[in-house]
Amino acid sequence: MILVFDVGNTNIVLGVFSGSRLVANWRLSTDRYRTSDEYGIMLRELFAFSGLEMKQIKAVVVSTVVPPLTFTLERLCQKYFNLTPLVVGPGIKTGLSIKIDNPREVGADRIVNAVAGYEQYGGPLVIVDFGTATTFCAVSARGEYLGGAIAPGISISTEALFARAAKLPRVEVVKPLSVIGRNTVASMQAGIFYGFVGQVDEIVKRMKKELGENTRVIATGGLAGLIAQESATIEQVDPFLTLKGLRLIYERNAQR
């Protein structure tokens, strides 16, 4: 079995694979001040809850956009699994040709998504990942990572609204019954939800003009399912796309 870590700015998503099958997945809050022992204790509890044993893990793969946590997770893996993790970064074999100005600056999570997306759906392809930031990644028919767009995530946008508008309350992000809100909460929910759907669809439509109208559009991330309900461009939601990509990257590097 292999253990994979997808470390984002808000959450750490973990998965355990037996071959190509995802047998367990968990979500923890990202905290760069937690120690390797604190994460280790959490993992012990999660493994036990899922009926798994930590000694079953034969390899670990890490993708992180929070550099301070890299060392913490390396220590975690060495102490609790007696393994050195494969950390996604420069020099790691992905199978993709990275066609951007500076390949070293692209986020590991975006490359991992592109690996899984192209393997599973082919290209041309647009992958929309709803995280702390909303990322749009373009992959060509030949499996080239072409770049993309980065926009503020829905949580960042709503937090900014609450922080700067003293009279506006915090609201839950849901699909409203109508775009015409009849009170402050409903009006905010309509603006947040449909504004975000419109942003996603407009960026995707412009990408498809450049990539070709036969471009597939896949979404992943925490709010993918909610936004896809109303989106005119998202064709499929794959909640575990990043975890699948980490497994694929492990397999491609294990064959070296």
Curated annotation (Swiss-Prot):
The active site is at residue 109. GO terms for biological process: coenzyme A biosynthetic process. ATP binds at residues 6-13, 132. Keywords: ATP-binding, Coenzyme A biosynthesis, Cytoplasm, Kinase, Metal-binding, Nucleotide-binding, Potassium, Transferase. One of its GO terms (cellular component) is cytoplasm. It comes from the Bacteria. Pfam families: Pan_kinase. GO terms for molecular function: ATP binding; metal ion binding; pantothenate kinase activity. A monovalent cation. Ammonium or potassium. It catalyses: (R)-pantothenate + ATP = (R)-4'-phosphopantothenate + ADP + H(+). Substrate binds at residues 107-110, 184. Its EC number is 2.7.1.33. InterPro entries: ATPase_NBD (IPR043129), Type_III_PanK (IPR004619). K(+) binds at residue 129. Its cofactor is NH4(+); K(+). Its main location: cytoplasm. Pathway: Cofactor biosynthesis; coenzyme A biosynthesis; CoA from (R)-pantothenate: step 1/5. It is found in: Cytoplasm. NCBIfam families: baf, PRK13318.1-2, PRK13318.1-5, PRK13318.1-6, PRK13321.1. Catalyzes the phosphorylation of pantothenate (Pan), the first step in CoA biosynthesis. Belongs to the type III pantothenate kinase family. PANTHER family: TYPE III PANTOTHENATE KINASE. Homodimer. This is Type III pantothenate kinase. It comes from Pelotomaculum thermopropionicum (strain DSM 13744 / JCM 10971 / SI). The gene is coaX.
